[in-house]
Amino acid sequence: MSMTRVLLVTLLTASSAFAQETNDPFPEPISSTDGVIRVNFTEFASVPDIDGQPARMMLLSDEPGTRRLFVNDMRGPLYSIDYDGRAVTQYLDIDGSDWGVSVQSSRNELGFQSFAFHPEFNRPGADGFGKFYTWTDSRNTAPDPDFTPGGGGDTHDTVLLEWTARDPSAATYDGDGPRELLRVEQPFGNHNGGQIGFNPTASSGDSDFGLL
């Protein structure tokens, strides 16, 4: 008990001394009548839970060709959202049994990392018509990876997939299975990919237009 009393006395003494030395440069309240910034929010859309767990959203992206927003859940689903936010539709579940992707999302950092729509996604006859890309962690570690960093073990792979929709404006994905473009071996369980995308400032005819 004596030690507690000593500490309390010391703290009180120090606090008192500190308070006496303080020189408040603004003794009067600063008026906030001009230039006040107010922050409000309105719920725009709600992405569904999975098995009672809230969606693990990673990226929200605009696809102006079909006038929709898209957002992914790291566990596999890709949702489309109307511009007014009223309709949220599952466009594709890349973890679905039809695709054989086997999304690895058992930990917070793992899962369906990112996606990108080709800038010509909704241009009939163009090379990028109907094409979009997903970048995801997968439990499948076959075929052999294109890149092996070394060190650690082969805990999972991160895979870049190309999907091709027959009708880009369809409510749900109507194409065949994806084409694998790149597979990277990950040596540790908390390693994964980052965001993928196209150069938003590139125009048709530029050297980097349509390059992921």
Identify the meaning behind each predicted range:
Residues 1, 18-20:
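Basic/polar N-terminal segments that are highly enriched at the extreme N-terminus
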Residues 2-9:
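Sec-dependent signal peptide recognition
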Residues 14-16:
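N-terminal signal peptide c-region/cleavage motif recognized by signal peptidases
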